[in-house]
Regions:
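P-loop NTPase motor module signature
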Residues: 2-212
């Protein structure tokens, strides 16, 4: 979520031809790029919860957008409940809840039959290739790595595009990145991405590269 807040703020600032921290700012843990001139602030749910402790009526905001509301978490559930209770005391406050997969009718009823606005998105063709890991093998971790190696090799021969690999945790990400680096893949840079990386290390995934 911290990475998303930073990158979305940077993208909006770029679209408006301004620098982050000006009219477009963001605030995440350990990083506050907000000024007196900030009109749009992107933040994590944890930051908004912390602000509620000091500003229970959220008077510094006239509009709050809760994005990806379907990603259920204790923070999001608490915020949605709190904002519903806050609206009678802040009738001027506008709440916008966005999601691609929630039940809009149910959310509308929860917020006193709030209007529903549907925005059509762009769809892309998706091809699914199933490569099962051999279940009889004793070394499951090695089988998983070999399956990743095979998939990377297969994709490298077909398209110049980047390859995104999802892993279950930080350790698995680091181990897989180390293993891929040992392959010395041509024109390929291996970039791990997880929450504990520094901002500069996370931002490397958005930088252009001559290869993949």
């Amino acid at each position: 979520r911290r990475l998303a807040a930073r990158t979305v703020a940077n993208r909006i600032a770029e679209e408006l031809k301004t620098e982050p921290g000006g009219c477009i700012g963001y605030k995440v843990r350990f990083s506050d790029h907000v000024s007196d001139n900030t009109m749009v602030k992107l933040m994590t749910d944890g930051i908004l919860l912390a602000e509620i402790q000091q500003d229970r009526l959220l008077m510094q905001y006239d509009t709050i957008i809760i994005d990806e509301a379907h990603e259920r978490s204790l923070n999001i559930d608490f915020l949605l409940g709190y904002l519903k209770e806050l609206l009678p005391r802040r009738p001027d406050l506008k709440i916008i809840i966005t999601s691609a997969t929630i039940d809009p009718e149910r959310f509308s009823r929860h917020f006193n039959n709030a209007p529903i606005i549907e925005v059509s998105g762009r769809t892309y063709p998706v091809e699914v290739r199933y490569r099962p890991i051999v279940e009889e093998a004793d070394d499951t971790e090695r089988d998983q790595l070999q399956a990743i190696f095979d998939a990377v090799d297969e994709l490298s021969q077909e398209s110049p595009g980047d390859i995104l690999i999802f892993m279950s945790g930080e350790r698995e990400i680091r181990d897989t990145a180390d293993a891929l680096n040992k392959l010395n893949l041509r024109h390929t840079e291996i970039l791990p991405l997880y929450a504990r990386l520094s901002n500069s290390e996370q931002n490397r995934v958005f930088q252009s590269h001559s290869g993949r």
